[in-house]
Structure formats: C-alpha cells, structure tokens
Design a protein with these regions (language model features):
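Short, structured protein-protein interaction patches enriched in aromatics and acidic/basic residues
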Residues: 3, 21-47
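Long, hydrophobic N-terminal alpha-helical segment
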Residues: 1-19
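Short secondary-structure capping/turn segments at boundaries of alpha-helices and beta-strands
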Residues: 14-18, 27-28, 75
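Detector for the mature cores of small, proteolytically processed
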Residues: 37-93
Length: 93
C-alpha cells in the first residue's frame, strides 16, 4: 500500500485546493517512460483512465498504472529545499 506523511497530505491538499482545479482534483504521479527511474508529479483535475486513486484525510493522489508497482509499499513525503517543496517517495521504516 502507498501512504503519505502528514506533511505530504497537507501539501497535496494545499496545491490541489485552488477552485480552478476543481473538487475532484489531486496530485498525479506518473512514470516518465519505459526504463525511466524518474516519476513525474503534477496537479490533475481528476484521475485518468487506469489510475489508482489513493485518498487520505482529503489528500488525493492518482497513480498511473506503470507507477503503481514502483511506489507500492512506499511513502510519499514532502521536503523543503532552498525554500521550495519537493515530493519524495521513500521506503517506510
């Protein structure tokens, strides 16, 4: 199961709460392509076909199909570096 830290949930709720994005919005995590290690993150108005939806405490994350096995059993965290927030997928301890 993919989970989120409290800070990650707060940031996801904050970045997806803009009225123009809509009530069904969330953060979408997607594979960057075959053989790529990187995952892309962006706001989305809703899940795309085939996305797995993870929701906790009002924070919604949409995982594209290729990303699911790469994040299964892991933890989404939000860290601040140089005044900017970055999302990090890490192992659960």
């Amino acid at each position: 199961m993919f989970t989120m830290t409290t800070k990650a949930r707060e940031v996801v709720r904050r970045v997806t709460s803009h009225p123009r994005i809509g009530a069904t919005s969330g953060l979408r995590i997607a594979s960057q392509g075959p053989g790529e290690d990187a995952l892309g993150v962006r706001t989305a108005t809703g899940p795309e076909r085939g996305d797995e939806v993870v929701e906790r405490d009002g924070a919604r994350v949409f995982l594209d199909e290729p990303a699911v096995p790469r994040v299964r059993g892991r933890l989404l965290d939000a860290v601040t570096r140089n005044g900017r927030v970055h999302f990090v997928v890490r192992n659960r301890h």
